[in-house]
Amino acid sequence: EGGCQVILFQGRVYDTMLQGELLGQLEARINDTRQGRGLEQEKVIRGLVRLGQELREELENAARGKTAREAGNPWIPAWLGYLTRFLSREWLEYKIETELGVKAGKGRKSEPGGSTECGPGPSHEVYHYTELQKMETHILPLGTLLHITAGNMEGLPVFSIVEGLLTGNVNILKLPGNDGGLSLDIILRLIRLEPALADYIYVFDTSSGDLPAMRRMEEMADGIVVWGGDSAMAAVRRSAPPGTRLIEWG
């Protein structure tokens, strides 16, 4: 597989020649992050909104007749326009409320007592009965997510990382082979706008055929987010360690 041939590790870019060394450090770095205070959802939203505004300005500059390079971005793929609409506070808060059932930044909801199953996704629910016999549900991050995205949908790695950040997870992204550096550029912009996110995003341009490296990443993950067809799903099911949650998107 081709690609940008770089690694993003705690906000800094490294050559893939250092992959083994960095993977050796990764679990300890993730554990340090997870033992901290956790990722504030408002910081995530604020960073994403700023990113959307910056990208929107570039699109507007291009629309006024400037070239993409003059606007500060040598590429403006079609999906970037959708991304700018996606990265608005209204849309992000709506997404959090409809998919998690909580107000943005609250991280909890209440509903009548009884059993409720948690569906698949990059978070999980912990239930506590209150004295009023209502069930208070705390939405907690799953922990560490490994994102394996398909190469036939431009921008998919960015959208997958956004999902993981909104639920407070540490995210390891395995880039698709034909990404060409587009996703990394967007993610670097996001970290520049909100530096607190650097400890929650790791990007590896690793070949799917590098089984030892893939296995090491899978072993660090509490959940694996898989975007792809049946063969991709089956391959991850075979290699995922027992107990790892698989979050499958076709």
Q: Which residue ranges define each predicted feature?
A:
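Conserved small-residue-rich beta-alpha loop and adjacent elements
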Residues: 127-191
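Short, contiguous clusters of charged residues that form electrostatic/catalytic patches at enzyme active sites
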Residues: 46, 127-128, 159, 231-234
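N-terminal Rossmann-like NAD(P)+-binding subdomain of aldehyde/semialdehyde dehydrogenases
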Residues: 1-137
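Alpha-helical scaffold segments in soluble metabolic enzymes
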Residues: 50, 185, 189, 235
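Membrane helical hairpin/interfacial module
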Residues: 72, 76-77, 81, 172-177, ...
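Conserved NAD(P)+-binding/catalytic subdomain of aldehyde/semialdehyde dehydrogenases
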Residues: 197-250
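Residue-level signal for inorganic ion chemistry
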Residues: 44, 168, 224
